[in-house]
Amino acid sequence: MLVHIGYGNSVLREHVVGVIRNDGAAIRRYRSMLKDSHKLIDATCGHKARSILIMASDHIILSAIAPETLEKRFE
């Protein structure tokens, strides 16, 4: 089942491991590490990233939708 993550982007529900808030130093370090290894996908369309989706393939996807809203969509 596809879940809308904002601005015309969707992900497969079965491939998402977790949704976390985009704040904190540890998250910034993790983002920069994955950006260097080409495993970061920006789905914000230029807007501020509010949440991070962690995928089963070790990729992370940045979303402009709040984590609480995404959690409701995954239910």
What are these regions (language model features)?
Residues 45-50:
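A short, compositionally biased
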Residues 20-24, 64:
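Ordered, soluble secondary-structure elements with a strong preference for glycine-centered loop motifs
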Residues 13-21:
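Phosphoinositide-dependent membrane-docking surfaces
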Residues 26-38, 42:
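Compact, glycine-rich, soluble single-domain proteins
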Residues 51-75:
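C-terminal structural segments of small proteins and small subunits
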Residues 11-14, 54-56:
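Short glycine-enriched loop/turn motifs at secondary-structure junctions
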Residues 1-11:
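Short aromatic-glycine motifs in intrinsically disordered, low-complexity regions
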